[in-house]
């Protein structure tokens, strides 16, 4: 499941650069679904750092701050999962 999430992060980054808002919304929904499945499979990852990353991810997405969203995905979530 980690590979699915990491692939989805790459897909979202590509969409951010293409500025396709519909595709971004769809890809973000898939990412969230994949993260829920990952948490179910790997209970240990539910810790303070992961929760903080999710808050940052939600904040960036809600504000539609694509630069911040890309930063959280590339420099916080991706390294955490690798």
PLM regions with names:
Residues 1-82:
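C-terminal-biased regions
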């Amino acid at each position: 499941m980690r590979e699915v999430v990491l692939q989805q992060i790459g897909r979202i980054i590509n969409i951010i650069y293409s500025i396709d808002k519909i595709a971004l919304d769809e890809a973000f929904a898939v990412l969230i679904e994949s993260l829920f499945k990952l948490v179910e499979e790997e209970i240990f990852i539910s810790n303070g750092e992961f929760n903080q990353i999710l808050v940052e991810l939600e904040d960036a997405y809600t504000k539609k701050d694509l630069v911040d969203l890309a930063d959280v995905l590339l420099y916080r979530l991706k390294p955490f999962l690798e």
